[in-house]
């Protein structure tokens, strides 16, 4: 499925941005043969399952956001998609060397602007992110534990979660320092 068909009416971006996203998708498909970036069963529907799933966070990034930190970046979802769509400094944290090289390749070949940190999040000095993102990395309570050094009052966390989202939110009910909001 080509990008305009897959995202018709879902995302309004320039032709240049769509071309960057298409080049990114082509690199995911190419590298998937060597590095397990995404579940192979999701490749036929990559535009909806990965690009659109990540792009839905863009409206939640306020204008003027300075720095976004994407942890457990893996194939770059949602970080690289947000880097293509938002005017913010994107930092991608990925501990796996092969995946970090993949992320660097995408940045170099597509012109998407981002910085890759090939290390575990626990070893990254605080970078002062306005927003922190993650997708399919860990439970909410574990994510907050891993990110403790990165979070300051006012940091917005945008975590893409699946079927267990409500249960994970409920497990955080004892934390009064967190404002929770579930988006469909």
What are these regions (language model features)?
Residues 54, 77-80:
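Acidic, metal-associated active-site segment
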Residues 72-75:
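Class I SAM-dependent methyltransferase "Motif I" SAM/SAH-binding loop
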Residues 79-81, 88-91, 95-184:
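S-adenosylmethionine
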Residues 1-69, 98-113:
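Class I SAM-dependent transferase core
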Residues 4, 11, 30, 37, ...:
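A near-ubiquitous, low-amplitude feature marking generic local secondary-structure context
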């Amino acid at each position: 499925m080509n990008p305009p068909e897959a995202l018709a009416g879902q995302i309004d971006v320039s032709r240049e941005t769509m071309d960057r996203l298409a080049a990114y998708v082509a690199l995911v498909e190419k590298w998937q043969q060597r590095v397990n970036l995404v579940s192979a069963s999701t490749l036929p529907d990559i535009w909806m399952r990965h690009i659109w799933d990540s792009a839905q966070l863009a409206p939640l990034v306020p204008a003027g956001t300075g720095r976004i930190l994407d942890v457990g970046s893996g194939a770059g979802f949602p970080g690289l998609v947000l880097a293509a769509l938002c005017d913010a400094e994107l930092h991608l944290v990925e501990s796996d060397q092969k995946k970090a090289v993949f992320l660097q390749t995408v940045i170099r070949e597509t012109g998407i602007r981002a910085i890759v940190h090939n290390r575990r999040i626990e070893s990254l000095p605080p970078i002062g992110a306005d927003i922190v993102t993650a997708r399919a990395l860990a439970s909410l309570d574990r994510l907050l534990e891993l990110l403790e050094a990165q979070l300051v009052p006012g940091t917005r966390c945008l975590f893409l979660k699946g079927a267990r989202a409500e249960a994970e939110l409920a497990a955080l009910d004892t934390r009064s320092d967190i404002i929770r909001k579930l988006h469909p």
